[in-house]
């Protein structure tokens, strides 16, 4: 699951209102496919992992799938991931966190179980939920996750006495802040 979480982070900043999700396929104790949700409107992590698996010449049937968020079970910009998992013959799905989106909310897990797929929930759950705190906030409130940053001088000012604009922080600090805002 930790590898799936690492992969999920690669999508941060590109998925807009969608969650960041990573997926890893394991068969006979070796990784046979990996994927993550790369961009809004693109393939979800599960489908990316299945495509990667097949591109390696591997067969996903009977494999275990580790995914940081419950697979979707509805049609949106892409078909349901549960459908792809079922059709691939995955035998066991390990889920990090339940998707609280009302379009999913446990239904993805239920669909997999109804098809005879073993599902283990809550693997590194707190970490997976934290990874998608921005997504969960948006789903629960329909409001953006707001984070603010400002710089000030040692005496608490944000501009010179004349009001003239000038940099308060150095270039390295500005770069660091830019990167930290992407990786909330």
Q: Model-found features: residue ranges?
A:
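Zinc-dependent deaminase
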Residues: 1-15, 31, 61, 75-182
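Short, basic and Ser/Thr-rich N-terminal targeting/leader segments
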Residues: 17-21, 43, 144-146
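Short beta-strand scaffold segments in enzyme catalytic cores
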Residues: 21-26, 150-151
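Short glycine-/small-residue motifs
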Residues: 34
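Conserved residues at the C-terminal ends of beta-strands
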Residues: 38, 68, 96
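A short, polar/charged loop-to-alpha-helix boundary motif
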Residues: 39-51, 168-175
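Mobile, glycine- and charge-enriched loop segments
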Residues: 50-75
